């Protein structure tokens, strides 16, 4: 099991293949992704790499983290993330991970935070059909309708789909295929859409449920 990387979502575009089919692509940039530290089985109980990205002002770093970055002999980072790895996949501290960490045709899993939508109704949040547009319905056309039963149980069960805060959740999209890699621009072109807004940070890992390379 290899380490993943922290990347930045740039935006979306589309291309046409040899068959004339339109393929949607998400552009992901890998820039300054660096190994900050190691977690070992003997000391911490598991094997992992600590990956950092985006330089930070030294004045905004806490004293304990200043020592961590000083020991690694690298500049402070804003984003830090641990990636579990197998024992034979350690990478030297201060090493920089580039786009060639992955290959064209490989399947990856993307973890990102969805765009926040604020307080949303049941029709937008849970795809409810709503009530009738006429025939006796007043002021409640987009409401969710009944939420409970009767005197027994006399309550609304936890988990009932209702209006509430929508979005801003961490989700993982699995088995997305890498269409192309641009080493000069440090871009990975991934087929399909990825959660999150432009310039948001996300995690790219080898697909756990699918073969890494297609033949």
Curated annotation (Swiss-Prot):
PTM description: Methylated by PrmB.
Keyword Ribosomal protein: yes
Keywords, alphabetical: Methylation, Ribonucleoprotein, Ribosomal protein, RNA-binding, rRNA-binding
GO molecular function: rRNA binding; structural constituent of ribosome
UniProt GO BP: translation
Membrane-spanning segments: none
Pfam families assigned to the protein according to its UniProt record, in alphabetical order: Ribosomal_L3
Superkingdom assignment: Bacteria
Sequence segments annotated as region (Disordered): 136-155
Residue(s) carrying N5-methylglutamine: 151
GO cellular component: ribonucleoprotein complex; ribosome
Subunit structure: Part of the 50S ribosomal subunit. Forms a cluster with proteins L14 and L19.
Family to which this protein belongs: Belongs to the universal ribosomal protein uL3 family.
Job of this protein: One of the primary rRNA binding proteins, it binds directly near the 3'-end of the 23S rRNA, where it nucleates assembly of the 50S subunit.
Record protein name field: Large ribosomal subunit protein uL3
Species for this entry: Rickettsia typhi (strain ATCC VR-144 / Wilmington)
Lineage: Bacteria, Pseudomonadati, Pseudomonadota, Alphaproteobacteria, Rickettsiales
């Amino acid at each position: 099991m290899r380490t993943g990387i922290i990347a930045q979502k740039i935006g979306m575009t589309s291309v046409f293949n040899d068959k004339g089919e339109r393929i949607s692509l998400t552009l992901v940039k890998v820039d300054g992704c660096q190994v900050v530290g190691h977690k070992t089985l003997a000391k911490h109980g598991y094997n992992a790499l600590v990956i950092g990205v985006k330089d930070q002002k030294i004045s905004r770093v806490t004293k304990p983290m200043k020592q961590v970055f000083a020991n690694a002999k690298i500049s402070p980072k804003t984003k830090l993330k641990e990636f579990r790895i197998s024992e034979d996949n350690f990478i030297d501290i201060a090493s920089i991970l580039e786009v060639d960490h992955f290959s064209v045709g490989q399947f990856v899993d993307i973890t990102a935070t969805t765009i926040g939508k604020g307080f949303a109704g049941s029709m937008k949040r849970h795809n409810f059909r709503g009530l009738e547009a006429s025939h006796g319905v007043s002021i409640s056309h987009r409401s969710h309708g009944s939420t409970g039963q009767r005197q027994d149980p006399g309550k609304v069960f936890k988990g009932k789909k209702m209006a509430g805060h929508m979005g801003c959740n961490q989700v993982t999209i699995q088995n997305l295929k890498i269409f192309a890699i641009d080493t000069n621009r440090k871009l990975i072109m991934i087929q399909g859409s990825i959660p999150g807004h432009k310039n948001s940070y996300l995690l790219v890992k080898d697909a756990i449920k699918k073969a890494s390379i297609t033949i």
